[in-house]
């Protein structure tokens, strides 16, 4: 996700190749030099595939939790060719936005979501790859104008589908992924607390 304007912004994750991300930005009228930082939610490949090349090629700083940075180091993604930093518990100011993390439940080292507060007093929460919606997630996204949240399965279809048993168990666990029903049950709470857009 690119969050910002035509002059500057940040990426939340970079799960495609660097070239795909550069091309997508260009298609949308954005220059890669507008990207001032990459905030990583967790170390799974579908969230970090382009991080190392983008950050190295364009001197983009990477922010993540301590656990995620440690996992990236173990994967050889911290190659010394770009700057990285543990996200501050008080938030980080980048591209005229305040970006704060909140913990999420997923099967990785230390996953998180982000709340982005803009200079014009708008707020956006991004919560992907959640096993369940904890009170910490609920409190973090409460009142945000826009909430981007992922749910990716119907429980019955998953249970009766072709996936191996262990994968089904992983997806359904509290460190897996939200079901569509669980997510939809929360949407009314978001709206009651001021959210006007859900993606």
Q: Language-model segments: what does each one mean?
A:
Residues 3, 42, 62, 99, ...:
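Divalent metal-coordination and catalytic microenvironments
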Residues 11-15, 35-43, 63-66, 125-128, ...:
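Active-site neighborhood of phospho(di)ester-bond hydrolases with catalytic His/Asp-centered motifs
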Residues 1-28, 112-129, 146:
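Conserved beta-strand hairpin/beta-sheet module of binuclear metal-dependent hydrolase folds
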Residues 135-199:
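Cap/insert and terminal regions of metallo-dependent hydrolase folds
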Residues 8, 58-61, 192-198:
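A short helix->loop->beta-strand "cap" motif at the edges of active sites that frequently abuts
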Residues 126-138:
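Active-site glycine- and acidic-residue-rich loops that bind
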Residues 66-121:
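Metallo-beta-lactamase
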Residues 19-64:
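Active-site metal-binding motif and surrounding structural segment of the metallo-beta-lactamase
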């Amino acid at each position: 996700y690119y969050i910002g304007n035509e002059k500057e912004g940040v990426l939340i994750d970079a799960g495609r190749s660097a070239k795909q991300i550069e091309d997508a930005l260009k298609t949308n009228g954005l220059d890669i030099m507008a990207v001032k930082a990459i905030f990583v939610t967790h170390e799974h490949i579908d969230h970090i595939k382009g991080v190392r090349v983008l950050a190295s090629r364009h001197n983009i700083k990477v922010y993540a939790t301590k656990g995620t940075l440690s996992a990236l180091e173990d994967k050889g993604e911290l190659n010394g060719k770009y700057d990285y930093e543990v996200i501050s518990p008080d938030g980080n100011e980048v591209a005229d936005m305040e970006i704060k993390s909140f913990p999420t439940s997923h099967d990785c080292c230390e996953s998180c979501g982000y709340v982005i507060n803009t200079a014009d007093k708008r707020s956006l929460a991004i919560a992907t790859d959640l096993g369940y919606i904890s009170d910490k997630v609920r409190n973090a996204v409460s009142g945000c104008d826009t909430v981007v949240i992922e749910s990716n399965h119907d429980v019955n279809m998953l249970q009766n589908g072709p996936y191996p048993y262990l994968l089904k168990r992983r997806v359904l666990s509290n460190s897996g992924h939200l079901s569509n029903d669980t997510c939809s049950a929360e949407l009314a709470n978001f709206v009651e607390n001021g959210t006007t857009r859900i993606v």
